[in-house]
Structure formats: structure tokens, C-alpha cells
Amino acid sequence: MSNVPTELKYATSHEWVLHEGDGIYSVGITEHAQELLGDMVFIDLPEVGTVVAAGDDCAVAESVKAASDIYAPISGEVVEVNEDLENSPELVNSAPYTDGWLFRIKISDESDLDELLDAEGYQASLEEDE
């Protein structure tokens, strides 16, 4: 049973978002996603300044098992990337909801948040997949 923090919003494609204030949202992949992928070896992050639309593939997580696209859960501009992942991609495995965040987006359309799931909805979607 994966850990699903209640303060986050989730995409069905297993990304999470956390409001950091001032329209800035941190984005990462869920504990469930990192469990499926296995040990991370490289994370290809978007460049700061990249404008993404909700649903766009914007990063790649490479693990010992596979390379998997990561999708933008909300639209906006990438304003920061987690540079610690360059030398320590395993943070995505060990701390997917904290130190293993991927990038931050300045949201351009708040209504994108309405399309995301709360923790209960995401947990239910995981149980349907089992």
C-alpha cells in the first residue's frame, strides 16, 4: 500500500503537485510510480523557462527497469528544477514527496487543479489498478 499524502493533488499519470505559495507548485512522481519504476539512475528534467501545458510530457525518469515519461500535471512555466537529482536521482526513490521533487511550475491556469485528484481519489484509482 503506497503512501498518499493528503496535502497533495494527484494526476492519474502518477504525478503530484504541492502549492508552495504565490502560484508556484512543486511537481514530483508518487511513491507508487517510483515503486513501479525501480531504482532511478537518471532524471531528465525540463529547462527553467520552459512553458508546459497540462498533460505534456516534460521530463523522463530513467530507472534500472525502464525510461518513463513524466507529464506536467498543470500548465505554466517551469521556474526551478531540483538540481540535487543530477547527482542523486535516488532521492526520487527514497523521498518522492520531499527531497525527490522534480521541478516547480508557476501555474498559468488555476482551473487545471480541478482536474487533479485528492488523496482519496488517487488512492481509489490505485486500488482499481490492482
UniProtKB/Swiss-Prot annotation:
Lipoyl-binding domain location is: 24-106
Keyword 4Fe-4S set for record: no
The answer to whether keyword Cytoplasm applies is no
| A Pfam family the protein falls into | GCV_H
Cited function: The glycine cleavage system catalyzes the degradation of glycine. The H protein shuttles the methylamine group of glycine from the P protein to the T protein.
Q: Which residues carry this modification: N6-lipoyllysine?
A: K65
What superkingdom does the record give? Bacteria
| Cofactor(s) of this protein | (R)-lipoate
Protein name listed in UniProt: Glycine cleavage system H protein
GO terms classed as biological process: glycine decarboxylation via glycine cleavage system
Q: Name the source organism.
A: Pectobacterium atrosepticum (strain SCRI 1043 / ATCC BAA-672) (Erwinia carotovora subsp. atroseptica)
Cofactor binding note: Binds 1 lipoyl cofactor covalently.
* InterPro entries recorded: 2-oxoA_DH_lipoyl-BS, Biotin_lipoyl, GCV_H, GCV_H/Fam206, GCV_H_sub, Single_hybrid_motif
A cellular component term, taken from the record's GO annotations: cytosol
